Design a protein with these regions (language model features):
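Class II aminoacyl-tRNA synthetase catalytic cores and aaRS-like
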Residues: 1-165
Length: 165
């Protein structure tokens, strides 16, 4: 791949991809999703914090990373599938040395997560991640300049640029 025309962000993403490949990353396809994100939100969205704690509801889902916030020993990531969005909470207590892998995730990557549903201090429905797996590494930025509108009008753009309503 000719890297002279790539942006710094794309170069960094390609370096991360090469690192993954050298570690044996092989685009796993063994994940089986039980429910769509919209199902989890509809079924458990009205549960209170204590009800979710008592229920101890496991959730596993896959989606595209559309938002990431790092806060020291925890990382919050919002993932999106075709049906909606949900927040995922990654903590050093649950993932130990794998938290660095989470910090290497980029917007546009596709991950599968497994964990327990809970509510945050801001009362947002969230999955407390116990295990995760990178399914696809994104090498392009979601905010890449697509060119003049005339030329790109009919092009298909990434879903995370224009999320469905």
């Amino acid at each position: 791949m000719d890297t002279k025309d790539l942006s710094k962000v794309q170069k960094d993403r390609n370096v991360k991809l090469e690192k993954l490949r050298s570690e044996g990353f092989d685009y796993p396809n063994d994940f089986e999703k039980k429910y769509d994100i919209s199902y989890l939100v509809e079924k458990f969205g009205n549960f209170s914090k204590s009800e979710l704690e008592n229920k101890n509801q496991m959730a596993s889902n896959a989606g595209r990373v559309v938002l990431k916030r790092e806060m020291g020993k925890v990382v919050f990531i919002t993932i999106e599938d075709f049906s909606g969005r949900i927040q995922a909470y990654f903590s050093k207590n649950n993932l130990e040395e794998r938290l660095e892998e989470v910090k290497d995730l980029d917007l546009g990557d596709i991950v599968c997560i497994e964990g327990i549903l809970f509510r945050t201090k801001t009362d947002e429905l969230t999955i407390e991640v116990k295990d995760f797996k990178l399914l696809t590494k994104s090498t392009t930025c979601p905010w890449v300049y697509l060119g003049p509108i005339k030329e790109t009008k009919r092009q298909i753009t990434p879903l995370n640029l224009y999320p469905s309503q």
